[in-house]
Amino acid sequence: MASISAYGRESPLSHKTGYDWVAQAFSGIMHMTGDRDGPPLPVGIGIADVSSGVHAFSAIGYALFHRSRTGVGQWLDISMVDSMFHMHDVSLQGFTLTKGKFKPFRQGNHHELIAPFGVFKGPSGYICILSLQPQWKNICEALGQPDLEHNPRYADGPSRGENQGELIEIIEKWMTSFPDNDAVLE
């Protein structure tokens, strides 16, 4: 037997009705979605509904395997809120491991620690660019500014993160020199 509910059968909130957006809000996913200074936003798709179904599918597979080995069935209790917790990257873990000293926040279109790592305005829409240290040299060369690679303001990940606003301007200005997004991506 498998069941999916907002909070789980044995939760103190098991008698409450819940929907996708409620699970997103209750789990903190909405707190992490949206612009830094804006309100919390839901993810644009029914992620709690879908993720809970995927969790149930996976759990059913393991339960059937367990039953084939032991002859014992199980009751699988899938909570929509619980299925959202694995969606957090460092936000939940960072808060927990630092006993609340790390305060996760909405990042908007750019990662708060890594740059360039975000959604940039291109000439005919938006382009997602993600670059870690191994790719930084290639980004600088593509920008036509190889000197940025060793500029202390951008030489390593933490420096680029601290100077992210300037770096976003450099990249978006460069993108305007192309006729469209396809040309940027070539």
Regions found by a protein language model. Give the residues of each.
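Aromatic-enriched alpha-helical interface/lid elements that frame and gate functional surfaces
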Residues: 108, 116-186
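Active-site-adjacent "lid/gating" segments in soluble enzymes
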Residues: 1-127
